[in-house]
Amino acid sequence: MDSVSFEDVAVNFTLEEWALLDSSQKKLYEDVMQETFKNLVCLGKKWEDQDIEDDHRNQGKNRRCHMVERLCESRRGSKCGETTSQMPNVNINKETFTGAKPHECSFCGRDFIHHSSLNRHMRSHTGQKPNEYQEYEKQPCKCKAVGKTFSYHHCFRKHERTHTGVKPYECKQCGKAFIYYQPFQRHERTHAGQKPYECKQCGKTFIYYQSFQKHAHTGKKPYECKQCGKAFICYQSFQRHKRTHTGEKPYECKQCGKAFSCPTYFRTHERTHTGEKPYKCKECGKAFSFLSSFRRHKRTHSGEKPYECKECGKAFFYSASFRAHVIIHTGARPYKCKECGKAFNSSNSCRVHERTHIGEKPYECKRCGKSFSWSISLRLHERTHTGEKPYECKQCHKTFSFSSSLREHETTHTGEKPYECKQCGKTFSFSSSLQRHERTHNAEKPYECKQCGKAFRCSSYFRIHERSHTGEKPYECKQCGKVFIRSSSFRLHERTHTGEKPYECKLCGKTFSFSSSLREHEKIHTGNKPFECKQCGKAFLRSSQIRLHERTHTGEKPYQCKQCGKAFISSSKFRMHERTHTGEKPYRCKQCGKAFRFSSSVRIHERSHTGEKPYECKQCGKAFISSSHFRLHERTHMGEKV
């Protein structure tokens, strides 16, 4: 005859059935289950349950009462009167089915599913009989390091790991190790994306039971702060809040000494030292130190913009961007700098500004040593070294290093300009552009250079100006090694290698690398030459051309070569001259590889491959590769000696 187990004789209720029982019926159920369990124990039935934790025995609980109590609690909710509607749907399997073995032998390292199995195995090391081993386990142990006393040897051995630093449970995915099995098991869920605790009311899922408990829809907030009256659902949140009044920061980083009021902030901070990035994107492989950063990054792939403005319908990836945008409609600037009184529409902008007064720049680039006031500024700067461009335009698939650059580019497709100047009515694609424009009305220049006293309307112009003093050129071309002060100059230079000409003339179809070149070209079609020389009456298409021309009258040559003393009217001719000293030949023929000092020279040379001869003599029809050869030929018709 097969042995009888507790499951064979136990009566099980569903949660719905349990909710229908009154208190007397539930009490009767507990009494019957206790009696059943007692009878099985008297018959010699051994109860081996992996969920009976050692700490229950340490507290002196009667095993029979504990088993029935736990069985009943699984139906009626928590000890605090939790209703069945607040109980989670637990979707995680027990160790028996997953093959997990959380109980480890401290002698040989062998793992076991059940603690009772570990107990039996331990006797093979100690040589003790069952009753003797039970007595051995119950002998009190005292930790020499902190003086803490333990009722059981295995509890003492676990505690010892906190002093020795032994972490036997290591994550196979990221290598992180843990002292105890339970935290290790919870950590594994962050990789698997497993969220076993589901709220029945709203369907939201959680990795940890504590998070689920905090989420409960009861509306009860039993923990109230006596100082400010704020109430909290859970005791831990209440304790953390109290520290905002006391200023207590009990969690201190051993590496840098920075202290935190919350253990989660402390653990997050530690990753800045260890470089740990446990959250990895499955689409692009990029890893993140923080779960919040990982979730925000996923939106760049999905295109999700969960924060929508009710005023204008504009949607945002991030809540911070949304909050900053909402203030634009109200015009409010509630955050004021204590030093200079300047007001800002976001607390973040105010904090960044305050650092301009104290000069604090705690974030340093490991490659070039440049320091930044904010970690996000450092991360954005690092992309200038790596060339990373994570933001892609869905319409033309062009990629960008910065989300702001992508948004700016997207307006070229939509033409959207939602930010309007209240004084002159001019509209802009971005709030930052509007702010810069507004300063043209009030002449405000809040950014002043400490070295030369020059002031600027915009912080970006100010930072670029500072480089003229430091000589810093952070943007380097990977193809030719040329470096630039401005990112815009660097991007324009890249087109000399790629041949990209995104600006097209609508009248003749000619394309240009730069928007300024297109604007100048368009004047050729209109014939309009608005800039006239006052001395000789000669007219020009561009203001830059007339300035250069005027120097032929004044004799001014502001650009002088330091090596040979020769002076030039224009900066372009001066730079070309410098190449005669340096030997630099930045322009290379794509077909034969021959290098040239000047872009005009490489264009003329390329015609020797294509056969193009754009300069044709009207008198004899002979064509030429270059304008200089054509002008020499024309003299033969005029009778000039060449």
UniProtKB/Swiss-Prot annotation:
Its main location: nucleus. The lineage of its organism: Eukaryota, Metazoa, Chordata, Craniata, Vertebrata. It is found in: Nucleus. Pfam families: KRAB, zf-C2H2, zf-C2H2_6. GO terms for biological process: regulation of transcription by RNA polymerase II. It comes from the Eukaryota. This is Zinc finger protein 14. A zinc finger (C2H2-type) spans 103-125, 141-163, 169-191, 197-217, 223-245, 251-273, 279-301, 307-329, 335-357, 363-385, 391-413, 419-441, 447-469, 475-497, 503-525, 531-553, 559-581, 587-609, 615-637. Keywords: DNA-binding, Metal-binding, Nucleus, Repeat, Transcription, Transcription regulation, Zinc, Zinc-finger. Belongs to the krueppel C2H2-type zinc-finger protein family. One of its GO terms (molecular function) is zinc ion binding. One of its GO terms (cellular component) is nucleus. Residues 4-76 form the KRAB domain. May be involved in transcriptional regulation. SUPFAM superfamilies: beta-beta-alpha zinc fingers, KRAB domain (Kruppel-associated box).
